From Swiss-Prot:
It comes from Bombyx mandarina (Wild silk moth). PANTHER family: 40S RIBOSOMAL PROTEIN S3A. The keyword Magnesium does not apply. GO terms for molecular function: structural constituent of ribosome. It comes from the Eukaryota. Residues 235-254 have a biased composition (Basic and acidic residues). GO terms for biological process: translation. It is found in: Cytoplasm. This is Small ribosomal subunit protein eS1. The keyword Ribosomal protein applies. One of its GO terms (cellular component) is cytosolic small ribosomal subunit. Belongs to the eukaryotic ribosomal protein eS1 family. Pfam families: Ribosomal_S3Ae.
């Protein structure tokens, strides 16, 4: 009989002994996701990340994460009918246990888009790239449908090609006017009640009556250089009450600082 080591036993240890299972959640921490101050509900939810370990910093792993939230969860209960509108928020900075997010895009749910499309009408779409006053480049998509006139006896309500081109041109003009003269905060405030789409519907009524006009999607193509002060202002935590350098503090005449009893 050959004498030697049993390689199988030396590598694996004792036969039948199971490895200790470590719960991966013990190495993770929970962080609160905060939406910008444009929305009435700031607490969006929570997210997990591995704890800081060596050169791997937890906050760096959170930056750049994108959260998709329904508008009904971001606004008051009375706005529940707007649940088909989804906002995308991107994590830009971490303050303590709070992840501060910024606007990253907007979209409609698939079921809402499918519900709007009907027979015997013309679908009109337009998209345009616009730049806000604070340096964000957005691609805005708009959609609308021709509406049957109440006095018309026809079953269909198809628009002519010239009318479609005129409506598409009007859509681009109104989107450009409303976005280029506004900051990102003001653009988001217009997207929440969809006021841009209402302006388009009124302006295009003279060309052809429209229904279900809405901003279908918004993409953020380019962002300005990141500044923590602007992000804090967006979250309503900016130093609006900060004293500018060189300002004199108001003190009564003959003011003397109090004497300290101990140092």
């Amino acid at each position: 009989m050959a004498v030697g080591k049993n390689k199988g036993l030396s590598k694996g240890g004792k036969k039948g002994v199971k490895k200790k299972i470590v719960d991966p959640f013990t190495r993770k921490d929970w962080y609160d996701v905060k939406a910008p101050s444009m929305f009435s509900k700031r607490q969006v939810g929570t997210t997990l990340v591995n704890r800081t370990q060596g050169t791997k910093i937890a906050s760096e792993g959170l930056k750049g994460r994108v959260f998709e939230v329904s508008l009904a969860d971001l606004q008051a209960d009375t706005d529940a009918e707007r649940s088909f509108r989804k906002f995308r928020l991107i994590a830009e900075d971490v303050q303590g246990r709070n992840v501060l997010c910024n606007f990253h895009g907007m979209d409609l749910t698939t079921d809402k888009l499918r519900w709007m499309v009907k027979k015997w009408q013309t679908l009109i779409e337009a998209n345009i790239d616009v730049k806000t006053t604070d340096g964000y480049v957005l691609r805005v998509f708009c959609i609308g449908f021709t509406n049957k006139d109440s006095l018309s006896q026809r079953k269909t309500c198809y628009a002519q090609h010239t009318q479609v081109r005129a409506i598409r041109k009007k859509m681009c003009e109104i989107i450009t006017r409303d976005v280029t003269n506004s900051e990102l905060r003001e653009v988001v405030n217009k997207l929440i009640p969809d006021s841009i789409a209402k302006d388009i519907e009124k302006a295009c009524h003279g060309i052809y009556p429209l229904r279900d006009v809405c901003i279908r999607k918004v993409k953020v193509l380019k962002r300005p250089r990141f500044e923590i002060s602007k992000l804090m202002e967006l979250h309503g935590e900016g130093g609006g009450g900060k004293r500018e350098a060189g300002d004199k503090s108001e003190r009564p005449e003959g003011y003397e600082p109090p004497v300290q009893e101990s140092v």
